[in-house]
Amino acid sequence: MKLNNLVFDFDKFAFEMANLKEKKHFDYLVTIVGEDFGGEEGLGCIYILENTKTNERTSVKMLAKRVGENDFVIPTVTGIWKVADLLEREVFDFVGIKFLGHPDM
């Protein structure tokens, strides 16, 4: 299955993800995969979303913003999908990306 790889600006990420849920009905966050894309891209995540009524899936690629020397951050989506709480903490543990606004980070 080939998925779209949507990419959003850092500052609009949370807004665009909320639009995917509310307007496009991607009501289920399947997973978040933390990754080192290498080179200039650096660390980031792939989000897999599903519309459970149509079974349509899409993916979103979000590059982490470097803060300081060794910190990488992405805005949290815990306010949009509750399951993001655990998925984001797992990415933090394995890859080191911090999620801005996460309730337990």
Predicted regions and their residues:
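Terminal low-complexity/charged segments
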Residues: M1-M105
